[in-house]
Amino acid sequence: MDALITEAKNGDKEAFVRLIRMNKQSLYKTAWIYLRDEQDIADALQNTILSCYENIQGLREVKYFKTWLMRILINECKDILRQKNHAAELDDFAEGVHCEELNLCEWKQLLLCLDKESRKIVELYYFDEFSVKEISALLEMNSNTVSTKLSRARAKLKKVIRR
């Protein structure tokens, strides 16, 4: 993947297209968490891809490509939300959440007991499979803060499930 990123940085359009295709599912899921509207998601993805293409030469370290790409997307999503002047609630999950004990509807209700920030961290960690380090970069938080919030969210969810 590093070689592909380097090729894209050097102007290889096909390499760039392959990079975007490799990350399309993560891009869509992240945009869905923020926007939950297909038209807004399409706009955010289009703007993100264009911005990434125009600025990929500025990427300092290839190992941070995905984090950099996701940061661009999150900023685009926030811009769209500001333009529409509505709050981003994260109570819907991406399809494909599987749990033997809880169905999707129950998961949605369960996560509502968390504050927005903790809910976002839990979703990025468990459903989008981001690492704590990636989440800290995406949300511009210290990784220890992300770990603490994740731990507290787990504890709160366990407590609610036991009731």
List the predicted regions and their residue ranges.
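DNA-recognition helix of helix-turn-helix
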Residues: 74, 78, 127, 133-163
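Structural recognition of an alpha-helix C-terminal capping motif at a helix-to-coil junction
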Residues: 29, 43-50, 54, 63-75
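Arg/Lys-rich amphipathic alpha helix in sigma70-family domain 2
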Residues: 57-60, 71-90, 152
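Internal acidic/polar
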Residues: 79, 83-112, 131
